[in-house]
Amino acid sequence: MPSGGIPTEQSVRFRVGDMPPLAEGFSDRPDTARGILDALIPGSTIALVPGSEFAEGKQNWLGASGKTQIAVMLAETLWRSGAVDMVVWISATSRSAVLSGYAEAWVAATGIEPTGTAESVAAQFVSWLAETSQPWLVVLDDLPSVDELDGLWPHGPSGRLLITSTQSTVAASRRRTRVFPVGFFSVREALSCLTERLSVDPAQRQGAIDLIEALGREPLALAQAAAVIANSALACRDYRDYFARRRQQIGVAAGEVPSAASVTWTLSLGQAEQLLPGQSVRLILVLIALLDGHGIPGTIFNTQSVSIYLGGTAVGFGTPVDLQPAWDALLIIERAGLISINRAEGSPTILMSPVVQAAIRVAAPAQVRDRAARTAANALLEAWPIDEPHPWTAAVLRANAASLQSVATDILWADGCDPLLLRAGRSLDIARLAGPAVEYWRELAVSCDNKLPSGHPDALVVAAQLAGAYLAAGYGAEAVAWYQRVLAERSLDLAPGHPAIIAARVSLADALIVAGKAADAVTALRRAVAESEQFRGPGHPDTLAVRDELARALEAAADVPAAIRLLTQTLAERERLQGAHDVHTMTTRGQLAAALLADGKIKQAISSYKRVLADREAVLGRDHPDTIATKASLAGAYYTSGKMPSAVQLSEQTCADSERVLGADHVDTLARRAALANLYYAAGRLGDAGTVLRDTVARCERVLPSGDPLTQTVHQSLASIAGDG
């Protein structure tokens, strides 16, 4: 799909998300699913929830009714029939997972790279869904609560929303949501499940009806039984006998009759261990049981951590890890019906029912669980890409880290705050998930206070991250409070002039500016500059960077002349030490040009902007975003000086460059088009101004969140032109 384009009826069809495969021998469940497909029409919302059978008794197996498999069937049916052109599948176990899924879908649908926070991108996507004529289906699988969808409910006349949840109250808070309970198999559905799976040898079907009744028609239990029978010489009646004996053994030990699914998984484990003797099957199962059963990246099992866990030896960096033991175990476990492996994507994904995961965790000895948890944490860190080039992969890794944290908290805090917890939080920051990031770091800070001694280094790291998250979310006052705490702690533990203390002062100043306390920011940065000059030297690159920050604070405090003096000094130092064509030198020169313009020194500002533009074109290239931004700034300076023809001509060039490089719907392109329209208006070209503004308004409303300041500004400009016309 072309960059910046909005999909049309002729757009390329696409699917987003890691949709699970249909299970082998899947039954389309004609009795349970009757009417769901007919109800899933454009504009509809359907919720699949557990049937009443799953609320009965002491044991509650809400995750074992087959809701996800029915959702997969419905999605595949709509896709293959051509009823929808877009399928978005999201494992909606948290708000951050939904936000990440929407962001990926937004890029796939529009070709526009996200530029704002994840919340703003999600709002854009929801707005786009409401307006597009392209038929779509969004599946939110395993939604724990409607609170996760506050402001994120997808809707639109061309779309369908399908939700699966263990909470039957999910639909109650949303009008016009049709609820379909998914309970045990009917006899017909159960028989279909068995006979489809046992199609190779009809003799294995002997005793099928008796087995179905023995298993109580529980979907998960039947699927596991069918897998074991299909991979053995057993018939249904043989499995029924094994099942009855094992159920009695477990019931005597537990003091109550266990559910069918709590028995069948142990028989599946027995078969897997017969097929692959040794400890690897159990070790891998416990490892999987601690992670996110909705999707565990196969790359985790390619790590040295897992290799050592299974008995391998450590290898040097760059030396291939022996993958055979882990994948031998995974394939055997899959044959036994305890997991499924989704091979549809580039990298395999391992899936396991939450019911089976819970049973394995209960059965595993504490020492084995703890070792598996330590391995899982290390393997996740090993598999986590440093630069996170693929947002969906990062979202899946965060989900697995969250699952591990929920079941192995003590292990992750045994020696301070585990690096995995910090990595997961930084991943939220990278993904610009501002709201979830604040919540995550805030909870981690509370855990630090409860679990770590006062002054622990990890607590200070978390405090700094929480402050940064508050700042990114626009909560200046909260960011100031936490940065002050960080600075106080740093000052107690470190010597004066330590780089960490200086960095803390700079961060505090950033927060003070956002909080509207520019004068306090100037005070903090003057001290930071003095310390940096004393302990690093006046010409150190970091000292020069802090001086640039001080100049920015001086401008914010309305002391532009002081900012100009400082920037002039810093620029001279940069030219002497780093060279005139260093990127940092160009940045300082551009900052000086802006200050000169703000101070009314227009000719000097234009001269500086011209120099920056020439340098950036020579060093970075004409199409670099910084070069285009400089050209836009120079056009603004021309306008301020009254050189209207030059301003218009350069602004037109800037818009053309921005559309070509960034895309027509990029927020910077939209802002530059609005600026061009204002120049047209100032030049008396009302018709041209109106044409550009109307197009820009339409684009802003389509791709920016509701109430975005740029959209409001463009509307006001258009209204002014209409009034003058």
What are these regions (language model features)?
Residues M1-V446, A463-Q465, Y470-A488, L512-K517, ...:
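Aliphatic-rich helical/repeat scaffold segments used for oligomerization and domain docking
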Residues V306-Y309, P325-L331, V355-G725:
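Intrinsic-disorder-linked linear interaction elements in eukaryotic regulatory proteins
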